[in-house]
């Protein structure tokens, strides 16, 4: 889908990726979870507008998906919590509860990583798929994501995990599940979406299902503002 937004050469694709990378890096420095998919599409659109060719049908499909991503995360986070908390709360043994969370963390964490790889690797590497091949592009993208997680993700983790809404271990796990389901559905549809937006929506959904309230409305407004700016500042 990304590679079909407009015709890309290796040079224009590199410029698009660099522009998106700079934008996301700046936002990450300030601890704001933003969308790499929206950043790359914005930069690709800028190239397309300059060269006179943008596939507006695909752009419309992407915009609709972007609006639906945080909403979907919120819905799946809320529903998953309401359903799974019933059998979980019936467990009396603290040891069994802790073991259940540990096992579920491994399973849901693996599912979340799989969904991330299935969807988000294409955000950046999609522009190169026609030039260097899909397999090579996917490999490079996967390695780059791993490097980013290890070196530069702490501030965004703290924003999502502690500054939006209060979560316990169980609701945090459910939030990851809600995000993973949302991103995986879009991966099946071949639409690149934002895991950042999906997890923010899922965190809010799981938090409200638990009975929590927003910890800091200013942080949420800051995130929403950054989402809008990411979409348009490169166009």
Q: Each predicted region: which residue ranges?
A:
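Multi-pass alpha-helical transmembrane bundle typical of ion/small-solute transporters
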Residues: 1-235
């Amino acid at each position: 889908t990304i590679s079909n937004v407009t015709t890309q050469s290796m040079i224009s694709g590199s410029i698009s990726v660099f522009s998106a990378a700079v934008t996301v890096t700046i936002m990450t420095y300030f601890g704001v979870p933003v969308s790499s998919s929206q950043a790359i599409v914005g930069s690709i659109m800028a190239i397309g507008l300059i060269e006179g060719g943008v596939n507006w049908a695909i752009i419309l499909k992407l915009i609709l998906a972007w609006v639906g991503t945080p909403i979907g995360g919120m819905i799946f986070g809320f529903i998953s919590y309401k359903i799974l908390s019933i059998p979980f709360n019936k467990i009396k043994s603290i040891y069994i509860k802790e073991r259940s969370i540990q096992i579920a963390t491994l399973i849901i964490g693996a599912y979340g990583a799989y969904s991330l790889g299935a969807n988000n690797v294409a955000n950046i590497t999609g522009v190169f798929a026609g030039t260097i091949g899909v397999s090579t592009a996917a490999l490079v993208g996967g390695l780059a994501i791993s490097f980013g997680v290890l070196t530069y993700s702490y501030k965004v983790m703290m924003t999502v995990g502690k500054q939006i809404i209060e979560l316990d271990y169980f609701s945090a796990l459910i939030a990851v599940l809600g995000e993973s389901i949302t991103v995986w559905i879009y991966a099946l549809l071949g639409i690149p979406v934002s895991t950042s937006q999906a997890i923010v929506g899922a965190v809010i959904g799981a938090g409200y299902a638990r009975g929590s309230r927003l910890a800091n409305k200013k942080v949420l407004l800051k995130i929403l503002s950054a989402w809008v700016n990411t979409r348009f500042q490169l166009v």
